């Protein structure tokens, strides 16, 4: 391998002016190589690069359009959901208000019904007490009357003789006669 390298270097150093030879100046060689590669890339790679960039651009544009459509659809769905939520919240609030008012009404009805029942029970209690009191009074009157009659009968039986009995009958008959 050393022999080949020495041979190429010797050819380059011995080449006469105006002929084709090996350039040993690295800076110039590198610039020439870069210019050749760039020229080839521009000439042959221009179409490929344009197609690649156009395809990439189209994909990006399509992705953006799809994203915009999805975003618009999501915004519409969100607006519909928010409107539905607002409607449902209003209905729930209305039901709550209606429910509370119905509960309050039922509570008032129950209180009124209980109050009326208590009044009826109180009235019946008073009537029952009055009836029992009247019955007790009547029982006491009857007992007192019976006791009084028994005492009167005892007194009369003890003090009544046949003369007094005849005298009482005559007085009563005469009173009846004056009444006619």
Curated annotation (Swiss-Prot):
Membrane-related topology note: Single-pass membrane protein
InterPro entries according to UniProt: ATP_synth_b/b'su_bac/chlpt
Transmembrane segments: 27-49
Chief location of this protein within or outside the cell: plastid
Assigned GO CC terms: plastid membrane; proton-transporting ATP synthase complex
Subcellular localization: Plastid membrane
Domain of life: Eukaryota
Entry's Gene Ontology molecular function annotations: ATP binding; proton transmembrane transporter activity
Subunit (UniProt): F-type ATPases have 2 components, F(1) - the catalytic core - and F(0) - the membrane proton channel. F(1) has five subunits: alpha(3), beta(3), gamma(1), delta(1), epsilon(1). F(0) has four main subunits: a(1), b(1), b'(1) and c(10-14). The alpha and beta chains form an alternating ring which encloses part of the gamma chain. F(1) is attached to F(0) by a central stalk formed by the gamma and epsilon chains, while a peripheral stalk is formed by the delta, b and b' chains.
Family, similarity comment: Belongs to the ATPase B chain family.
Role according to the record: F(1)F(0) ATP synthase produces ATP from ADP in the presence of a proton or sodium gradient. F-type ATPases consist of two structural domains, F(1) containing the extramembraneous catalytic core and F(0) containing the membrane proton channel, linked together by a central stalk and a peripheral stalk. During catalysis, ATP synthesis in the catalytic domain of F(1) is coupled via a rotary mechanism of the central stalk subunits to proton translocation.
Name this protein carries in UniProt: ATP synthase subunit b, plastid
């Amino acid at each position: 391998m050393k022999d080949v390298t020495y041979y190429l270097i010797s050819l380059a150093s011995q080449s006469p002016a105006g002929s084709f030879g090996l350039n040993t100046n690295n800076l110039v060689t590198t610039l020439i190589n870069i210019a050749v590669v760039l020229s080839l890339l521009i000439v042959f790679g221009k179409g490929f690069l344009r197609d690649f960039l156009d395809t990439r651009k189209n994909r990006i544009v399509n992705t953006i359009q799809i994203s915009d459509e999805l975003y618009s659809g999501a915004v519409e769905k969100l607006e519909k959901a928010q409107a539905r939520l607002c409607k449902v919240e209003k209905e729930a609030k209305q039901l709550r208000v209606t429910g509370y008012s119905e509960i309050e009404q039922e509570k008032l009805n129950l209180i009124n019904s209980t109050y009326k029942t208590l009044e009826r029970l109180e009235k019946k209690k008073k009537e029952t007490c009055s009836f029992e009191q009247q019955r007790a009074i009547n029982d006491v009157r009857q007992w007192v009357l019976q006791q009084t009659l028994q005492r009167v009968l005892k007194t009369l039986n003890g003090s009544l003789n046949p003369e007094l009995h005849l005298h009482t009958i005559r007085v009563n008959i005469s009173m009846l006669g004056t009444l006619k």
